[in-house]
Amino acid sequence: MPPIKRQPGGWVLPGYKYLGPFNPLDNGEPVNKADRAAQSHDKSYSELIKSGKNPYLYFNKADEKFIDDLKNDWSLGGIIGSSFFKLKRAVAPALGNKERAQKRHFYFANSNKGAKKSKNNEPKPSTSKMSENEIQDQQPSEPNDGQRGGGGGATGSVGGGKGSGVGISTGGWVGGSYFTDSYVITKNTRQFLVKIQNNHQYKTESIIPSNGGGKSQRCVSTPWSYFNFNQYSSHFSPQDWQRLTNEYKRFRPKGMHVKIYNLQIKQILSNGADVTYNNDLTAGVHIFCDGEHAYPNATHPWDEDVMPELPYQTWYLFQYGYIPTIHELAEMEDSNAVEKAIALQIPFFMLENSDHEVLRTGESAEFNFNFDCEWINNERAFIPPGLMFNPLVPTRRAQYIRRNGNTQASTSRVQPYAKPTSWMTGPGLLSAQRVGPAASDTAAWMVGVDPEGANINSGRAGVSSGFDPPAGSLRPTDLEYKVQWYQTPAGTNNDGNIISNPPLSMLRDQTLYRGNQTTYNLCSDVWMFPNQIWDRYPVTRENPIWCKQPRSDKHTTIDPFDGSIAMDHPPGTIFIKMAKIPVPSNNNADSYLNIYCTGQVSCEIVWEVERYATKNWRPERRHTALGLGIGGADEINPTYHVDKNGAYIQPTTWDMCFPVKTNINKVL
């Protein structure tokens, strides 16, 4: 209870009613946000006192909430109040907050030796089925730390769990998917391995193709690696994807929770032909999330560095590198002034320039992301918008007809079954073909940068990037305009090339014809006009989920050609690297312990979904196992199974990847 001998209004800051100690619980209406937070803080203190605890001598949850409530309050009272309790947090012991005390504990692996206890009282991974009412905030299981909003918002927390021996368990394996009417939750865990890259150095590397006319490139390779979760197959099993595309008319990601835990840091010791792997209890790994996208983008769609599809596969993290400039424009040939000016402006990004955690064996980090993006629609149009009419009813529309082969003309009434429409095909470019050979690294259409005065020797390929592909919504005329990708079955050396099939939606594969009195000619290039109608490109389980929309002053309609979701702020890249541990040498040359780190990474995503509802009487097509293939060592194993050698049988055709927009009919 507050002291009996106190001033009636309490010891508050001038102009405030609650911001200060010993004021009454009902002192009138709070004057601002800081005063309102102080009122709530006083009520919490009163409850703690009634329970027999003294909140004035210990830092407690009420103090933590008060700091959090004022984190964006820049008033004088808010700053003073927040600063006071931050100081209290630093010097006062915690009141009954075991987790906070545990996080303060310095985790050496031997510190918990022999301390293994029953985990019945510990929170289990969220493996129970979640109903709609149980999903309160559209998020997977979250850490206790606060969450920053925004598409790329992320927070990290370091903590640990109980364990024994030389390892400290900081979490269990999570997996499986849960389906409700409004949300689907996917949960996956993989074992990962990260090693020292570039001997802890940054390097500039030139990538020069064997064909002198091809695209050369300049790359900055770094000592960092990273995690990439950008593919549907990393999150949905084939059966889960089958269920998603068979039962829901649209879906989109809403929240993602990533946890990196159960870290084990090993030192590699070589003694002649013998190699020993020892636990290193004091070495560390650096880890942070680029939630603000301050560093060049690493997760390009269709890269092979994504989280493995199979839960038992080890995820070997790729090295991070980025392109600092167009190499052809920065060679400074013949002292070219333009190229010299470009070369002098090349940026250099060092990831050590950001705050980050340094974790040791037994510690963990967690990150949260919020998505703000459009839907992936799964319905197909069974007719084009030009046929949205009743063909039995006559129309009042008439048209001007020019007779074949002469200049005579007449006006006639439009037939009921051929009524005109206001809706036009979507845009696209088809009047080009790819330039060979393969080593030239070119595409049917190229977009580049060519500053006046620069000297370009390698041709357009040297300063250009290819569209992928530029068909838009138009019907592909050549293979250049079809989305294609390679599938590399695990454990084999056979690459399979998958080519997209027709999407079966009448708002894709569109064509535009122009009459010339005697016939019609195909318009290969269709620009953007009013009243164009089209559907986005259909995705499959093998597609990337998102792509980062470039930062620019202006842009037209955003519609990635591969169906991925363009995002201003996709999930920030989570970077990781081994800590640098120098060792002495005779000539003071750089020498470091040879270490690596392995651990578990779990990724939980909440997907917002809508079930389909239809008045269609007839059965509709659905994805089934009957459309899959047979393969493997003896050609007896079905797709998405393993053969006698353990090789995973991957799909070999577009339909085996279960594309969207092929099953559920929609009424336009």
From Swiss-Prot:
It catalyses: a 1,2-diacyl-sn-glycero-3-phosphocholine + H2O = a 1-acyl-sn-glycero-3-phosphocholine + a fatty acid + H(+). A motif (Nuclear localization signal) lies at residues 611-622. It is an enzyme of class 3 (hydrolase). Keywords: Capsid protein, Host cytoplasm, Host nucleus, Hydrolase, Lipid degradation, Lipid metabolism, T=1 icosahedral capsid protein, Virion. The keyword Lipid metabolism applies. Residues 11-66 are annotated as: Phospholipase A2-like. SUPFAM superfamilies: ssDNA viruses. The keyword Signal does not apply. Residues 107-162 are annotated as: Disordered. The N-terminus of Isoform Minor capsid protein VP1, VP1u, contains a phospholipase A2-like region. VP1u may play a role in the disruption of host tight junctions in the airway tract. This is Minor capsid protein VP1. It comes from Human bocavirus 3 (HBoV3). The gene is VP1.
